[in-house]
Swiss-Prot record:
Disulfide bonds: none annotated. It comes from Mus musculus (Mouse). This is Large ribosomal subunit protein mL42. Residues 1-31 form a transit peptide. The lineage of its organism: Eukaryota, Metazoa, Chordata, Craniata, Vertebrata. The keyword Lipid biosynthesis does not apply.
């Protein structure tokens, strides 16, 4: 309990130093937020203040009108000379990647069989026919 009171007092004194309160009311001079990630030349006004009781932080950030001269039109895509990838091109690229991965699997199995002196059949997965006949819970030996 004492730690919570100490934290509240220290927190209140910190905010009193950051934001001045005069005669129990909000100060007329609000400071710009130091925690803003916006650059200084950004067209935005951010002000912080405390309420009279010191329990609530008030943030004022009105929307600022942007002059028409500072805006840019949205670029329209050229439908005749479109250099962007289409859906079909993306699918073809993915299919080529899959085929190349399948081709890489062949030499890998041959290399494994040479390294461990086994047949190539050991490195291929068993099919569904073999997996169905495998006993999942064989009886325990006595």
């Amino acid at each position: 309990m004492a730690a919570a009171v100490k934290w509240a007092i220290s927190n209140r004194t910190i905010w009193k130093h950051l934001l001045p309160i005069q005669n129990g009311a909000l100060s007329s001079a609000c400071h710009k937020s130091t925690y803003s990630s916006l650059p200084d030349d950004y067209n935005c006004q951010v002000d912080l203040a405390l309420t009279a009781d010191g329990r609530t932080i008030v943030c004022y950030h009105p929307s600022v009108d942007i002059p028409y001269e500072h805006t840019k039109p949205i670029p329209q895509p050229d439908l005749l000379h479109n250099n962007e990838e289409t859906h079909e091109q993306i699918l073809k690229a993915k299919l080529e990647v899959r085929k190349s991965k399948q081709l890489e699997q062949g030499p890998m199995i041959e290399q494994l069989s040479k390294v461990f002196y086994t047949t190539k059949h050991r490195w291929y997965p068993h099919g569904q026919y073999h997996n169905r006949r495998k006993k999942l819970n064989p009886p325990r030996d006595r």
